[in-house]
UniProtKB/Swiss-Prot annotation:
<feature type="signal peptide">
    <location>
        <begin position="1"/>
        <end position="18"/>
    </location>
</feature>
<feature type="glycosylation site" description="N-linked (GlcNAc...) asparagine">
    <location>
        <position position="117"/>
    </location>
</feature>
<feature type="glycosylation site" description="N-linked (GlcNAc...) asparagine">
    <location>
        <position position="116"/>
    </location>
</feature>
<feature type="region of interest" description="Disordered">
    <location>
        <begin position="252"/>
        <end position="314"/>
    </location>
</feature>
<feature type="compositionally biased region" description="Low complexity">
    <location>
        <begin position="257"/>
        <end position="268"/>
    </location>
</feature>
<feature type="compositionally biased region" description="Low complexity">
    <location>
        <begin position="285"/>
        <end position="296"/>
    </location>
</feature>
<feature type="glycosylation site" description="N-linked (GlcNAc...) asparagine">
    <location>
        <position position="43"/>
    </location>
</feature>
<keyword id="KW-0964">Secreted</keyword>
<protein>
    <recommendedName>
        <fullName>Uncharacterized protein DDB_G0292248</fullName>
    </recommendedName>
</protein>
<dbReference type="InterPro" id="IPR040310">
    <property type="entry name" value="DDB_G0292248-like"/>
</dbReference>
<keyword id="KW-0325">Glycoprotein</keyword>
<keyword id="KW-0732">Signal</keyword>
<dbReference type="GO" id="GO:0005576">
    <property type="term" value="C:extracellular region"/>
</dbReference>
<feature type="glycosylation site" description="N-linked (GlcNAc...) asparagine">
    <location>
        <position position="109"/>
    </location>
</feature>
<feature type="glycosylation site" description="N-linked (GlcNAc...) asparagine">
    <location>
        <position position="96"/>
    </location>
</feature>
<feature type="glycosylation site" description="N-linked (GlcNAc...) asparagine">
    <location>
        <position position="161"/>
    </location>
</feature>
């Protein structure tokens, strides 16, 4: 999530001895100076990695606006940059739900698929699949345990300037070790930590094969897509009006058997998630307010609500 481009002189930071994303001066993100395509990935065709992501109160773009979310996600991701395809095997735990499944994205036919509970949902890919990685700037060095790493900040687009992100790369090996995200607004602290395991600088092509349950599935229309993408939505987060503007009532998401279709016609703009299959009791966390489940998700990212930009990688 990005920043207006302000041009002024940058004094480079030498060594970050005790690493904290807040220890990196904001001015590094506010100028184009020093950003370049990392030498390790200039000819990168893709990647594969296992990952674990923990987020607390971190600002994320969603179909309902930019909201703070807290969740844990783990899994596997691989992307073929040249072939414009991505696969994610994910498991997510958040306040009101637990879910897991597989995500497939294909830039060439502009379609994405989510497989959850053996069912498949297809949606139009409403963002361009990137053909290269973003630019980086080295701002220091530190250690993970006793492993020396370089600290690189990520330069992205301007659409959603609410978080800062950096990555830690093992010296001389081009191996991703970790990534850190933090809310730009220091009065509303939020952080995410993303660790990489078994990282490889090449895609696993066998993962891009679409499963048979998706072969005859057609993309849904745009209205249904919005409700499908509301993965992290819960009442406490969506009713935070600060991130929806002064004149927009923050929507609320409930799941009920009596409201099987998305309803956005009432005065309070209450949104109801559409039921797609019989709920699996193991995937539903019940609270006094509502029983919550999700059947799919969107690869919403820290770069833009309309850009993949390799969320799991950077």
């Amino acid at each position: 999530m990005k920043v207006s481009l302000l041009i002024f002189l940058i004094i480079l930071v030498g060594v970050i001895k005790s690493f904290d994303i807040n220890s990196i001066d904001d001015s590094h993100w506010e100028s184009d100076e020093g950003f370049e395509h990392h030498k390790c990935w200039k000819n990168l065709t893709g990647y594969y990695t296992e990952f674990a992501l923990s987020a607390y109160n971190t600002m994320f773009p969603t179909p309902y606006g930019v909201i703070p979310v807290s969740f844990y996600e783990g899994g596997v991701v691989t992307a073929d940059i040249k072939g414009q395809q991505m696969y994610v095997h994910y498991g997510i735990v958040a306040k009101n739900f637990t879910t897991w499944g597989q995500y497939y994205a294909y830039g060439k036919n502009q379609t994405q698929y989510v497989v959850n509970n053996s069912s498949c949902v297809a949606m139009k890919l409403q963002f361009p699949f990137p053909d290269k990685l973003p630019k980086f700037k080295k701002v220091g060095t530190t250690k993970i345990g006793q492993t020396d790493v370089d600290v690189w900040i990520v330069k992205g687009k301007q659409q959603c300037n609410v978080t800062r992100s950096c990555i830690l790369i093992q010296k001389d090996t081009c191996t991703l070790m970790s990534a850190n995200f933090g809310n730009k607004d220091k009065s509303n602290l939020g952080f995410s930590l993303l660790n990489y395991y078994r990282y490889e600088n090449k895609p696993h092509y066998d993962k891009f094969q679409l499963p048979s349950q998706c072969w005859d599935v057609k993309p849904k229309d745009e209205n249904e897509n919005k409700e499908e993408q509301g993965l992290f939505a819960n009442e406490e987060e969506l009713e935070n009006k600060e991130y929806f503007g002064d004149n927009q009532q923050a929507p609320s998401m409930r799941i009920t058997k009596n409201n099987p279709h998305l309803n956005n016609n009432n005065n309070n703009k209450k949104y109801h998630h559409r039921e797609h299959e019989t709920p699996n009791p193991d995937l539903i966390k019940t609270t006094t307010k509502t029983s919550t489940k999700t059947t799919s998700f969107s690869r919403a990212t820290n770069d833009s609500p309309k850009s993949i930009d390799f969320h799991h990688l950077f």
